[in-house]
Amino acid sequence: MGIFSGGKKYDPDELMKGKLSAASDGLKRPCVSILWAGRLIGWKHPDASIRLAESLKEKGYSFKMTLIGTGEMEEQLHNMIRDKSLEDCVEMPGAMKASEVRSYMEKADIYLFTSDFNEGWGAVLNESMNSGCAVVASHAIGSVPFLIKDEENGLIYENGNQKQLEQQVCRLMDDAEYRMKLGLNAYHTIADLWNADVAAERLIDLCENIIFAKKTKSPYENGICSEAKVMENDWFGK
């Protein structure tokens, strides 16, 4: 398997230090930054983030959620924010340049990836992990089984299971150390394995194996150029 996107090298310590939220809500609790980015369309399910925000606010968490993007659901989402009185904790700044989105990722504590099976890969997962975010992602997204090791470099929830999404995010809200650990591991997954240098090296090695050694099976167990096996839709949790 081999898709990589947006790989950048950071000083890991400086990257994670930048995520130590300086804001407070008056009760001296950290204000956690939560990010969602993409087209505001049905199969990306941005509305799941709004329902999550409602639940977090009801539970008394201090957070700031940002949804970046435009699309057919934009008005609906604005209405949800207004109707649920979430204006103080949810913002929708609209479309942004890729560099601006990356800047938000570099500061975000948690990244939400809520798409369903229509998301063939989802390069935004590479980018958010590369930015050191603790990712909570739907199991249906094409890249998730290849990039995320559940509870090691991110958290996975069953597609469409709002309660499970909320539970996973609450785990990260409650444990800053664990959140930072997942984010740092996510960064190293992309920076050390899913990058252009590794891709070039492995592609050459794979071609030489096929041409000269007549080996048709990839020598790599995971990462770029590893075998992309057919997976059942309900692979998560098995």
Model regions: which residues?
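Conserved donor-binding/catalytic core segment of Leloir-type glycosyltransferases
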Residues: 23-44, 50-53
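A structural motif in glycosyltransferase catalytic domains
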Residues: 34, 48-50, 65, 165, ...
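Nucleotide-activated donor-binding/catalytic signature segment of Leloir-type glycosyltransferases, i.e.
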Residues: 78-96
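Short alpha-helical donor nucleotide-sugar binding micro-motif in glycosyltransferases
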Residues: 95-96, 103-108
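Acidic donor-binding loop of glycosyltransferase active sites
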Residues: 106-120, 133
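Short hydrophobic beta-strand element within catalytic cores of glycosyltransferases
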Residues: 134-138, 148
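Conserved acidic donor-binding segment of nucleotide-sugar-dependent glycosyltransferases
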Residues: 150-151, 155-162, 171-176
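A short, well-ordered alpha-helix in the C-terminal region of glycosyltransferases
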Residues: 164, 171, 178-192, 199-205, ...
